[in-house]
Amino acid sequence: MSDGKAISTHETRRRILHAGTELFRRSGYTGTGMKQIAQAAGAPFGSIYHFFPGGKAQLGEEVIRTSGAVYLGLISALMTPYEDRVAATADAFAAAAGTLAEVDFADPCPIATVAMEVASTDETLRQATSEVFDSWIDHLAAYYAEGGVPGSAARETASSVVALLEGAFMLGRAARSAEPVRAAGTAAAAIVRAALAGA
């Protein structure tokens, strides 16, 4: 395969993955058809099955894992510069509230959208979403532990923060308001503050 053809092939696959991510985020996994993905990607319909022979389920799993890694990078970039874990948490939620408004209250997190739809019907996708959430919690637990939260409390704190964020996104979408995310940020910062005080 020539270099040009390899680049073109890689680009087509990237476009399909990106289109799947955006459509799953906006319309959900079950509400998105493969023809829609091909059209949004500007790719021949058959090329989806060339790159993802497992079909929609394989594409869905890759969207979950790829998006999970991207969001973990965003979390890290937002919070790592802060030594103050309380301020880091509050500012991360403030940024999330801004993002929710920017995307016009569509779900900014495709992982949560897919998880809610398929958790009881597709074990592969359920496992993928669970592993992504665990990776976020592990990362945050390490971050809070490094900031002084005892190891036994760090994971519980991280789990609470992730749960607050994901729940707030859902409430924000329903209300078409960023206020639930801001309120959750206040609660999350208080949880981190209390965990540090108990150190």
Task: Locate each region found by the language model.
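N-terminal intrinsically disordered/low-complexity leader segments
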Residues: 1-11, 198-199
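Helix-turn-helix
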Residues: 2, 15, 19-62
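Hydrophobic alpha-helical connector segments
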Residues: 62, 75-107, 157-161
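All-alpha amphipathic helical-bundle segments outside canonical DNA-binding/catalytic cores
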Residues: 87, 127-128, 146-162, 179, ...
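Short secondary-structure transition hinges
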Residues: 90-142
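Amphipathic C-terminal alpha-helical segment
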Residues: 99, 120, 142, 162-180, ...
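Hydrophobic alpha-helical segments that form the core
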Residues: 107-113, 152-171, 183, 187-191
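Hydrophobic alpha-helical bundle segments that form small-molecule/ligand-binding pockets
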Residues: 121-123, 133-158, 195-199
